[in-house]
Each structure stands twice: as structure tokens, then as C-alpha cells.
């Protein structure tokens, strides 16, 4: 587990690892879920969550990664070094089991996104029989499994691409919400940045929705096995965690403000979570069509 990595495999930069971690931790759906549950009050919730949980959590992961910079097993290696091999085994096993549903739904999510890109609706998966759909999802899963087995160079390229794309798309949405009234005839909502608008009510219902934000910012330790692929792990791994943390904080807060421009903060639509993306895509598409016309 703790075998030194040869110099030829130390090809990751801290920026690339930060983008890879960002793509595994963050998604725009987290902003949508936060706004759907709390409206603009999610801004304060994000700040609370980042202050008491996410920032300390990422700093601890960065410290562990720099301390055990020669390990190749990530969390399992850390537990093995500080406790026992048996506990490390159980940690690795439970980590894999809890990620099985997450990994299994990823290929199907790609097909849903492809359907929106081609047909501008979510009908692609409904056009297929369950057997065909699951067969395609399985082929996609094995393809990316094969691609990942090619080594760190392949992961570096696809991880950096995924992270960069998420960052760019998040900021494009924020810019679109701000620029929509100026480039089209689309109207956006206005709101006051005061305590009444931003401060949530700290009751039981609020605490239950706060749990959604906790799960939204977990998983920065997933890329810890690649810490020894950095040229200077003790310095660069914490730097990559700080880089990722800043990007998450900025996109979460600015993205929530942008949602408030497109959806009335005083009358947040009460629709199921799986329909929020439909609302978001339809509204964005209408703005873009007005621009093209």
C-alpha cells in the first residue's frame, strides 16, 4: 500500500488534481437542490456549511494526504497507518459498497444528458426497452473502466476536462442569468439582499433540508490515492484541496444568486427534484431562442 511512486509517474499538477477532485465532489445539481429547498436562504446555508464542515473537512483531507504522501490506498492507507489493517479493510470495503449505486447510475445519467443535447427533452431513455438501455449503460461502464485502467495519464486528461467543463458551465450559467435582460427581452426577478431575504428560520424543517447540503459537498478524499503522483505531494496536495474548495464555494454562492434571478425567490416552484432540471433547461432555452431571434 505504501510503495513509493517512480518519478515517471509523478505527472499530475496540483491544478489538474484540483479539477479532478472538483468534478467528483461538485455538480450544478447541488445548487438546484439547495435553491429548490430553501430559495435564496440557501446562500446563508451554504456559508454555514462551508464554515463548519466543508472547509475544515477539506483541510483535514489535505493534511492527511500530505502526511501519508507515499501511500497508494487513500483513506484505507491512512487508517492502516494510524490504526490496523483489519479496520482499513472494512473502511475500503464499505467505501466501495456505498459507491456502487452512485457508479451504476452514472452511465444512465449520461444517456439522459445526451437525450437533452439531441432532442432537447428527456425522451431518449424512454424510447428504449429496459434491456437495450441497461446494455448500453453496461457498455459505457466497461468502456470507462477500461479507460481508467490505462493509468494516471488517461485519468489526468479526462479528469481535468470534466473539472474544467463543470467550472466553465457553472460560470456561463451565472453570466447568462446576469446578462439575460441586456442581450434579450427576457425578464429576471429582483430581490433585496437583506436579512429577511437571506436568513433562514432555524427550525426542524430547516435542519432536515440542511442534510442535503452536507451530502452535496462530500467526497474530496476520493482522489487521495493519486497524491503520490504529484511532484511535491506534501505541498501540492493541500494546495489542490484549497483550489477545489474555493471553486466550490464560489460556484455555490454565485449560482444560488443566479437561480434567484431566473426563479422568483418569493415563490419557489414546488415541483419534484427530478423536474427542476426540466424547468431550468426550458427557461435557459427560451432565453437563448430569444437571443437567436
Where would I find each of the regions flagged by the language model?
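Membrane-interface "cap" regions at the ends of multi-pass membrane proteins
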Residues: 1-44, 48, 54-62, 70
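Membrane-interface helix termini and inter-helical loops of multi-pass transporters
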Residues: 33, 114-126, 183-196, 268-270
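TM-loop-TM module centered on a large, flexible mid-protein loop between adjacent transmembrane helices
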Residues: 76-80, 84, 116, 120-121, ...
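Membrane-interface loop-to-helix entry segments
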Residues: 114, 132-186, 218, 240-249
Amino acid at each position: 500500500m505504501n510503495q513509493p511512486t517512480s518519478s515517471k509517474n509523478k505527472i499530475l499538477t496540483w491544478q489538474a488534481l484540483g479539477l479532478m477532485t472538483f468534478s467528483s465532489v461538485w455538480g450544478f445539481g447541488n445548487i438546484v437542490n439547495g435553491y429548490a429547498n430553501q430559495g435564496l436562504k440557501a446562500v446563508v446555508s451554504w456559508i454555514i456549511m462551508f464554515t463548519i464542515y466543508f472547509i475544515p473537512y477539506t483541510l483535514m483531507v489535505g493534511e492527511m494526504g500530505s502526511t501519508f504522501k507515499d501511500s497508494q490506498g487513500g483513506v484505507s492507507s491512512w487508517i492502516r497507518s494510524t490504526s490496523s489493517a483489519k479496520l482499513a479493510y472494512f473502511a475500503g470495503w464499505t467505501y466501495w459498497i456505498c459507491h456502487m449505486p452512485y457508479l451504476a447510475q452514472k452511465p444512465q445519467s449520461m444517456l439522459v444528458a445526451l437525450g437533452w443535447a439531441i432532442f432537447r427533452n428527456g425522451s431518449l431513455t424512454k424510447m428504449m426497452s429496459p434491456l437495450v438501455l441497461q446494455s448500453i449503460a453496461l457498455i459505457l461502464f466497461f468502456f470507462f473502466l477500461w479507460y481508467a485502467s490505462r493509468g494516471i495519464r488517461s485519468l489526468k486528461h479526462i479528469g481535468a476536462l470534466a473539472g474544467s467543463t463543470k467550472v466553465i458551465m457553472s460560470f456561463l450559467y451565472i453570466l447568462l442569468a446576469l446578462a439575460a435582460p441586456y442581450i434579450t427581452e427576457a425578464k429576471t426577478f429582483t430581490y433585496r439582499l437583506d436579512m429577511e431575504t437571506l436568513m433562514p428560520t432555524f427550525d426542524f424543517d430547516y435542519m432536515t433540508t440542511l442534510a442535503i447540503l452536507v451530502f452535496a459537498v462530500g467526497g474530496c478524499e476520493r482522489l487521495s490515492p493519486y497524491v503520490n503522483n504529484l511532484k511535491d505531494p506534501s505541498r501540492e496536495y493541500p494546495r489542490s484541496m484549497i483550489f477545489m474548495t474555493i471553486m466550490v464555494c464560489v460556484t455555490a454562492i454565485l449560482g444560488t444568486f443566479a437561480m434567484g434571478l431566473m426563479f422568483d425567490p418569493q415563490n419557489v416552484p414546488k415541483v419534484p427534484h427530478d423536474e427542476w432540471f426540466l424547468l431550468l433547461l426550458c427557461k435557459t432555452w427560451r432565453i437563448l431562442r430569444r437571443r437567436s431571434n
